[in-house]
Amino acid sequence: SLFTPTLSRTVSASALRKEPKWTRFPVSEAREEIIHYQLSDFFTIKRGIATGDNKFFILSRDQIEALGLPWAVFRPILPSPRYIADDEVEADNNGVPMLDRQLFLLDCRLPEEKVKTTYPALWAYLEHAKKDVASRYLCRSRKVWYFQEERSPAPLMCTYLGRTDTKSGRPFRFILNHSRATAANVYLLLYPKPVLARAMAQDHTLIRRVWEVLNALCPDALLGEGRVYGG
C-alpha cells in the first residue's frame, strides 16, 4: 500500500532530472551514467498490425482454400510468439515462413464495388461478417472497414509485452525474420534507419550480428527500459 510499501527507495532530484524513465524506480537504482544510444537511434520501431478481429482477418491455408478466397488478397503474417520455437524464421521460395503454423492476413485494398465484381467469394465473406466485424471500433474508424494498416515485413521483430518466455527464461525475444511476413501487435517491428540500412546492404552479415547482440542483452536492462503491464 501507499503507507506500507513492499519496496521503497530514496532518489535524488538530480538523478530524477537525468532519468528518462521514472518507472525504473524503486526496483532499480539511479544510473551511474546516462545511456548515450537507444534502439530508436538505429531503428524505426512500430508496433505490429491491430487487425480489429484476428479470427476474421487472419486465416490458415486450409481456411482460405475451404472458403475459396483469392490468394491475391492475402499475405503471410507471423503467428503468436509461442508458436515460434526458434528466434530465426526461415522462408520458402515464396517468402512464406517455414513454420508449422502458417497464417495469412486478409489485406485487400480494393473498394467494395471492385471486390464485388472481381472476387465474388471474398465479397460474400465480407458481407457475411459485415454486421459484426465492421462495427468494431478499429474497423469502423477506417476509411474502408477491412483495410489494414501498412506494415511491411521487418528484418527484426521483438516480442515486447515483457512476460517471461517459459522456454528461454527471457522477457523479450528478438526474432530474425527472413520471410516476407508481417506481424500482429504482439510484436514490435524494427526497421533499420538509413545509416544502418546502408551498412547492412554493404555487409550482409551485419544484420545477424546485430540480432545476436540484441538477444545477448541483459534481461534486467531490457526490463528496466520496457513498458510495465499488469496481469
Positions of PLM-derived features:
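Flexible, glycine-/basic-rich loop-and-beta segments that form/coincide
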Residues: 1-46, 52-54
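Polybasic, glycine- and aromatic-enriched phosphate-binding surface used to engage nucleic acids
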Residues: 30-231
